[in-house]
Amino acid sequence: MHRPENRADLTPDLTLVRLSHGEGLDLPAYETAGAAGMDLRAAVPADEPMTIRPGARTLVPTGFVFEIPAGHEGQIRPRSGLAFKHGITCLNTPGTVDSDYRGEVKVLLVNLGSDDFVVERGMRIAQMVIAPVTQMAIREADGASTTARGGGGFGSTGLS
């Protein structure tokens, strides 16, 4: 696990509240120096692993409340290895954790593979990227401005 030495690079701080079923789990962590996302672990009971059948989806607890700083969001994203090797991904990706949310962060996993997948306690199930958020002033107009692209939608710019 990567632990940055320069604390100035970590500002602002991210405060976590550990829930009782998260006791004993490692804190979410950046696994390498260049990692954009911190890995989230499954807070399922050790004696009750969770099985996700092919085509099924389930919410997996992380055991933590995240106090995301104002002006930021937490983006829940799949782990590439789980997706490639097992067909396990996050159903709503990226899932947004708002800065004013104070409940437990849970991960919505879906099994797109052909075999049952067992989620065990402490398994790294997803990653969270903390990203800045811009809230826009919203105004209504009578028409859209003109651009070279215009209203061309899906596939309108071609492949090459």
Curated annotation (Swiss-Prot):
Enzyme class: hydrolase
Gene Ontology MF terms in the entry: dUTP diphosphatase activity; magnesium ion binding
Gene3D superfamilies in the cross-refs: 2.70.40.10
Matching SUPFAM superfamilies: dUTPase-like (SSF51283)
Biological processes annotated in GO: dUMP biosynthetic process; dUTP catabolic process
Known cofactor(s): Mg(2+)
UniProt superkingdom: Bacteria
Pfam families xrefs: dUTPase
Xref: CDD domains: trimeric_dUTPase
EC number annotated for this UniProt entry: 3.6.1.23
Sites where the protein binds substrate: R79, S80, G81, N92, T96, V97, D98, K106
Keyword terms of this UniProt record: Hydrolase, Magnesium, Metal-binding, Nucleotide metabolism
Catalytically driven reaction(s): dUTP + H2O = dUMP + diphosphate + H(+)
Function: This enzyme is involved in nucleotide metabolism: it produces dUMP, the immediate precursor of thymidine nucleotides and it decreases the intracellular concentration of dUTP so that uracil cannot be incorporated into DNA.
Similarity comment text for this entry: Belongs to the dUTPase family.
Xref: NCBIfam families: dut (TIGR00576), PRK00601.1 (NF001862)
Protein name as annotated: Deoxyuridine 5'-triphosphate nucleotidohydrolase
Organism: Sinorhizobium medicae (strain WSM419) (Ensifer medicae)
Recorded name of the encoding gene: dut
